[in-house]
């Protein structure tokens, strides 16, 4: 619903005519827990009429109060919210200057805040602590991915939570697709052989010629959440690959929409040249990828993990890789992270370790802040929301 729709719903405040400047004092009506509240959405608002199209009007009145919170302080916020986004946030809200840590919050420094912006390093408090320290709080906009570590006390206390998890999923999807395309060409094993000596060049050529490439090659996905589904779409639409997927929450209709074939993990590991893990990080999935599955990998198969390390029984993966050196593991995550000194992963030729780089890095992080600013604008103006996280969703999200 646009701003004009909200204006026209105001009881005895506006007629069907275009609202005047004097009438447009408060333009957001939010029914929250049965309480009607009126807010402005910043210095300007656009009101749409059939005759006049769009006209811009100055809006005066009290605005919602917002604050940035992060245990990493200013540096943590600047990683995700660039100057342009923060300036636009200041035009939507009255801001409490500074960045506040959990200690600051418990000390009562954001008691007037109704909206919070954060990212990795979001302060973790109990439901009671939030209620005491931020009694006016209505919404949290989290410019990062998983909210599992902090969201439950807020949601159970009636605070709405929004996350940029889909924005953070874009670079993970891109990274994963790139790794799959390389793996299907035999890149990792061929690169290992070529790097040893000139004499190993012929062995590298024999190795990569045993691969099918990226035409009708079976690829397996464990998990079809936002990232898994994004990977599936790209593999099906941009490449002619046969995608097998396992996800107990995915229906046949959803699988058909994505163009994937549902299969159990045993079939996926036995059939697919490349298998990529995108399972949600919940207690039920811990240790689900074990020797019974890894031992089924094809002799030149690749296992990719950009999800979470906890789903992998690492000693079982090591065993399967040692039994068949032509197999490869590309691990952007481990459990713990990083792996402890002396772990078998270190020094194994067929293990590629990266320091959790699949997610947003550098300028990619600013996309998450920009998406949360846009979601906050939508929330204020009554437009359809895109990235809200509910208690029900939290049970199955990564």
Predicted regions and their residues:
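Rossmann-like adenosine-cofactor binding region
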Residues: 124, 250-344
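NAD(P)-binding Rossmann-fold cofactor-contacting core
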Residues: 238-256
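Oxidoreductase and adenylate-handling cofactor-binding alpha/beta cores
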Residues: 173-192, 237-241, 370-378, 383
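Phosphate/diphosphate ligand-binding glycine-rich loop within oxidoreductases
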Residues: 114-196, 211-212
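Glycine-rich NAD(P)-binding loop of Rossmann-like domains
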Residues: 191-230
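Short, low-complexity intrinsically disordered segments enriched in small and basic residues
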Residues: 1-31, 46, 53
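N-terminal glycine-/charge-rich "phosphate-binding" loop or analogous flexible N-terminal tail
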Residues: 37-39, 43, 47-115, 397-398
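Rossmann-like dinucleotide-binding domain for NAD(H)/NADP(H)
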Residues: 161-162, 299-398
């Amino acid at each position: 619903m646009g701003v004009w729709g909200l204006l026209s719903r105001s009881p005895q405040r506006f007629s069907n005519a275009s609202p005047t400047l004097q009438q447009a004092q408060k333009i957001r009506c939010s029914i929250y827990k049965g309480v009607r509240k009126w807010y402005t959405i910043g210095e300007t608002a656009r009101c749409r009429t059939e005759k006049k199209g769009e006209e811009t009007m100055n809006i005066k009145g009290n605005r919602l109060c917002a604050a940035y919170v992060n245990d990493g302080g200013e540096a943590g916020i600047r990683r995700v919210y660039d100057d342009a986004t923060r300036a636009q946030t200041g035009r939507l809200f009255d801001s409490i200057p500074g960045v506040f840590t959990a200690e600051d919050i418990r000390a009562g420094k954001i008691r007037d805040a109704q909206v919070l912006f954060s990212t990795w390093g979001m302060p973790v408090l109990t439901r009671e602590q939030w209620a005491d320290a931020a009694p006016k709080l209505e919404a949290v906009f989290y410019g990062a991915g998983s909210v599992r570590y902090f969201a439950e006390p807020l949601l159970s206390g009636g605070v709405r939570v929004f996350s940029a998890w889909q924005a953070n999923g874009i670079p993970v999807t891109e990274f994963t697709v790139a790794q799959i395309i390389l793996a299907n060409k035999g890149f990792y094993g061929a690169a290992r052989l070529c790097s040893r000596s000139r004499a190993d060049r012929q062995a590298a050529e024999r190795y990569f010629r045993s691969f099918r490439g990226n035409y009708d090659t079976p690829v397996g996905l464990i998990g079809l959440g936002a990232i898994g589904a994004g990977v599936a779409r790209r593999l099906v639409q941009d490449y002619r690959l046969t995608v097998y997927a396992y996800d107990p929450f995915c229906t046949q209709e959803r699988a058909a929409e994505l163009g994937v074939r549902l299969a159990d993990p045993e079939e996926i590991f036995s059939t697919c040249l490349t298998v990529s893990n995108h399972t949600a990080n919940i207690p039920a999935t811990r240790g689900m990828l074990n020797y019974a599955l890894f031992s089924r990998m094809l002799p030149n198969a690749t296992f990719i993990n950009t999800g979470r390390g906890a789903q992998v029984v690492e000693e079982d993966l090591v065993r399967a890789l040692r039994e068949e050196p032509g197999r490869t593991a590309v691990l952007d995550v481990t459990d713990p992270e990083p792996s402890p000194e002396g772990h078998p992963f270190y020094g194994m030729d067929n293990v590629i370790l990266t320091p959790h780089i699949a997610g947003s890095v550098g300028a990619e992080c600013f996309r998450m802040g920009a998406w949360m600013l846009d979601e906050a604008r939508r929330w204020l103006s009554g437009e359809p929301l895109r990235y809200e996280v509910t208690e029900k969703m939290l049970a199955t999200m990564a």
